[in-house]
Amino acid sequence: MAGAPGYFSDEQFREACAELQQPALAGADWQLLVEASGITIYRLLDQPTGLYEYKVFGVLEGCPPALLADVYMDLDYRKKWDQYVKELYEKECDGQTVAYWEVKYPFPLSNRDYVYTRQRRDLDVDERKIYVVLAQSISAPQFPEKSGVIRVKQYKQSLAIESDGKKGSRVFMYYFDNPGGQIPSWLINWAAKNGVPNFLKDMVKACQNYPKKT
């Protein structure tokens, strides 16, 4: 497998924790994209692709951090609440757990699929409990490309979660993917602007309905 040597470093987990405390927006042209319903989204142009990287900050009310992390990691449950999932499962490859994810795209666009690895760590930082999940695309021969489905080869996501001091969660998310194919960059960026807040709203509902909730 290629694309993620050593997968995730301690430093990557520390960086996600640090962003939760103090957003790292200086020194680059991060632009405020949208601010609504307690969620703030910034974007940064990735010059080679014409697409944007995104950073999301906010509070998800009514979702305790441990529950939110469990829901985010539970791929079987995601198939029930995420309407865009066509196929989603994990498989052991060379001693590493690898996820396969096919996403429904509206006609006439081709579906996209992802092959990625992810890791969760529950960290104690200055007496704060922080849950961090990192994910990134990899190349794995056990998942050959499918006819009619476009493989996303650039995908990276970070998620850091802690208590908001009440019954909800403070959240930081970093997100970038390049869906490839002949989709105008403006359409991809429009989808990201609308899709991220909608995904977070859906995740709040998923937390409230989680069957394994204690």
Role assignments for model-derived ranges:
Residues 1-214:
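Eukaryotic helix-grip
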